[in-house]
Regions:
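Blade-level signature of beta-propeller repeat domains, shared across WD40, Kelch, NHL, RCC1
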Residues: 308-349
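Short, solvent-exposed loop/turn segments at conserved positions within beta-propeller repeat blades
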Residues: 57-62, 109-120, 164-174, 228-231, ...
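Short loop/turn segments immediately following beta-strands, especially the blade-tip
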Residues: 125-130, 179-189, 236-243, 348-349
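Beta-rich, blade/repeat-based domains predominating
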Residues: 33-48, 55, 61-62, 82-102, ...
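Bacterial Sec-dependent signal peptides at the C-terminal "C-region" and cleavage site
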Residues: 3-19
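A short helix->beta-strand "capping" segment at the edge of beta-propeller domains
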Residues: 16-35
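Residue-level marker for isolated small/hydroxyl-bearing positions within beta-strands
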Residues: 52-54, 105-107, 158-160, 226, ...
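Beta-propeller fold detector
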Residues: 26-29, 74-81, 133-140, 187-202, ...
Length: 349
């Protein structure tokens, strides 16, 4: 275990008077050196916060899962089982089922390495007394598995790129896959022949060709997915059999939300979205109205700034945000990867 690290447990206050936006993010935690690239999060059965660290920023650090307790202790829980062909794992979206099994999007191809192309997996980790007992490959051969949610015994996974599916426009196609929770060794081809591919979208922004990413369900069973490059959130309605009835742009306002990375939903039905490129977090109400809640300039995150936010999660009455802090480019506020490695926090209200 990594030595315990203290975190700040108080909620950030509204700072509308000091800032044009409703809130200013605050520091939630400094992460140890074994977690230079924090990403997806999920709440464990015992209430701990589990953080996936694909560690793209430092490949000498094995991809791992961190555990954060309610009293502020941060420890390394375990390394994620690697794919033998590549020698690494790349955990991004994660989710627990009711039995306490952890499902992981192992986005092998994120780095762009040729040997990892179309080698992405969905893993199911089974535990006994908090120790890994069995690793099951639910699906393999995936191009870019990213976000993951569980509903009614099914796994819903976003694939941010499906480059083998060609749209006449030449624009990027991405989609949502659905697997049974008990599936094993599903061979994905990343084509329209995949029976598990339930819907696709096109990313229309030619400057940012990166597709479906964040994913969340509301209480009614509507599925919401973020089309990253377009800064749009789609609402997908399904029948009782899980067949897609509609897939429409539900919320879009690029003045408030430029890119849609990880997403979560609060008890009031508001969807919180990490605006990765803009160093911001937005909140979308039940009517689809988007409001930017907080934004940071290029920063190192040491003062609680949103240092390229990757995913939010509601935990213990706050919104915790992972700071990916790695990708640069013309559309990104972030200019470099740097220490410290952080999680930020926002108030729910």
């Amino acid at each position: 275990l990594i030595g315990a690290t203290c975190i700040q447990c108080t909620s950030p206050k509204q700072k509308g008077g000091e800032n044009a936006l409703p809130q200013k993010s605050e520091l939630f935690a400094n992460l140890p050196d074994c977690c230079p690239t924090p990403d997806g999060m999920a709440i464990a059965p015992n209430g701990d916060l589990i953080l996936a660290c694909p560690n793209f920023a430092d490949i000498t650090q094995p991809a791992c899962l961190m555990r954060i307790t309610k009293n502020g202790e941060i420890t390394k829980w375990m390394d994620v089982p690697v794919l033998e062909e590549t020698g690494w794992a790349s955990p991004m979206g994660i989710a627990f089922n009711e039995e306490g099994d952890l499902f992981i999007c192992d986005n092998q191809g994120w780095s762009g390495a040729e040997k990892a192309q179309n080698k992405g997996r969905v893993l199911r980790l089974k535990f006994e007394n908090d120790q890994l007992k069995e690793t099951i490959t639910v699906a393999s051969g995936m191009e870019h598995p990213n976000g993951l949610r569980i509903r009614n015994g099914k796994l819903y996974v976003t694939q941010s790129s499906l480059s083998q599916i060609k749209d006449p426009s030449g624009l990027l196609v991405s989609g949502v896959y659905c697997f049974d929770m008990n599936d094993r060794d599903v061979a994905v081809t990343n084509t329209l022949e995949d029976k598990n591919l339930i819907t696709t979208v096109i990313t229309k922004n030619p400057e940012v060709q990166y597709g479906l990413d964040g994913i969340v369900f509301n209480e009614a069973g509507d599925l919401f997915v973020g089309n990253f490059g377009d800064g749009a959130v789609h609402r997908i309605k399904m029948d009782v059999e899980g067949n897609v009835l509609t897939n429409d742009v539900w919320a879009k306002d690029t003045t408030q939300l430029r890119t849609t990375d990880g997403m979560c939903i609060d008890d009031k039905g508001n969807i919180w979205v990490a605006d990765f490129s803009a160093n911001a977090v937005a909140r979308i109400d039940k009517d689809g109205k988007i409001q930017r809640i907080a934004q940071s300039p290029d920063c190192d995150g040491s003062d609680g700034g949103l240092d390229q936010p990757g995913e939010p999660i509601v935990w213990n009455g706050q919104v915790i945000v992972s700071c990916f802090d790695l990708v640069t480019g013309p559309d990104k506020v972030n200019t470099k990867h740097d220490k410290p490695f952080t999680l930020a926090k926002l108030s729910l209200e």
